[in-house]
């Protein structure tokens, strides 16, 4: 005889699956925090007008020196991500629910792993995606102005290097995988992870509504609102070259010369 479905059983089911979901989230150790700063978001998007300004201290002599900084309009719009699964009502009635625990654990693991996937994909795609100055994050022509208000003739600065291969007269760009030098020693990191709403598990489990009524199944879904973007290009250098000590020194030396406006 099928087990009657009661509100108490639905509550117990959700408690168990939420526990599985949380357990799955702990299975995905994060790496993204090493290269991206986490910024909480409370709206549809965040605008990072302060990008381009490097905070620095000077000796306080007389009045404070207040300089009008160039304001940038770089914005990151939050995106909603989801994952949804369905459980057959017959399995619920037949008390055959333990088989779904690994599914909810994997859903939790996927939710926790996604920030890594987003951040490292943004790093890879930085050669084709714009940062705060309007240039691609990895670019050969980042404008650096002589004054902090963005006035004057800009000097073009590159934060990428593409090696040449082949013999003289028949050279071509290196086509192997790129690697990256990142300055992650500061509070501000090269990339931005924007967190609007953390991953949560919800369910549609009323027996006389939705898919339980039309398709004989209960629906469970996880969702989160988040997105990624780019911080200071000065903190990153892309090397399209073999990984050698000479190439490493080239990139490190170039990064030491980077400055902001002014």
Regions found by a protein language model. Name each.
Residues 7, 20, 69-70, 205:
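Short alpha-helical segments and helix-capping/turn motifs at coil-helix boundaries
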Residues 5, 9, 73, 91-99, ...:
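Conserved aromatic-histidine-acidic binding/catalytic patches
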Residues 23-79:
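Assembly/oligomerization interface modules of large self-assembling protein complexes
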Residues 7, 18, 78, 245-248:
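Alpha-helix initiation and N-capping motif
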Residues 74-128, 216-224:
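Long, contiguous amphipathic alpha-helices that act as assembly "spine/axial" helices in icosahedral shell
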Residues 2-5, 141-262:
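Sequence/fold signature of self-assembling virion shell proteins
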Residues 1-28:
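N-terminal alpha-helical "arm" segments
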Residues 124-140:
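Short, conserved secondary-structure transition motifs
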């Amino acid at each position: 005889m099928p087990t009657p479905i009661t509100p108490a059983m639905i509550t117990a089911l959700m408690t168990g699956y939420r526990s599985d979901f949380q357990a799955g989230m702990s299975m995905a150790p994060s790496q993204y925090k090493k290269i991206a700063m986490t910024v909480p978001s409370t709206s549809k998007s965040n605008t990072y007008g302060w990008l381009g300004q490097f905070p620095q201290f000077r000796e306080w002599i007389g009045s404070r020196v207040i300089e009008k900084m160039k304001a940038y309009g770089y914005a990151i719009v939050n995106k909603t991500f989801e994952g949804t699964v369905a459980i057959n009502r017959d399995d619920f009635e037949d008390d055959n629910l333990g088989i779904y625990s690994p599914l909810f654990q994997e859903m939790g693991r996927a939710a926790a792993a996604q920030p890594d996937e987003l951040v490292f994909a943004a790093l890879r795609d930085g050669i084709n995606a714009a940062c705060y100055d309007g240039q691609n994050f990895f670019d050969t022509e980042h404008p650096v102005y002589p004054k902090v208000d963005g006035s004057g003739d800009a000097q073009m600065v590159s934060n990428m290097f593409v090696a040449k291969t082949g013999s003289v007269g028949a050279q071509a760009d290196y086509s192997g995988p790129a690697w990256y030098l990142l300055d992650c020693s500061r509070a501000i990191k090269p990339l931005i992870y924007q967190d609007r709403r953390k991953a949560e598990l919800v369910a549609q489990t009323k027996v006389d509504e939705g898919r339980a009524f039309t398709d004989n199944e209960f629906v469970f879904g996880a969702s989160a609102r988040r997105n990624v973007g780019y911080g200071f290009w000065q903190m990153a250098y892309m090397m399209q070259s073999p990984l050698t000590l000479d190439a490493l020194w080239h990139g490190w030396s170039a990064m030491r010369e980077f400055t902001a406006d002014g």
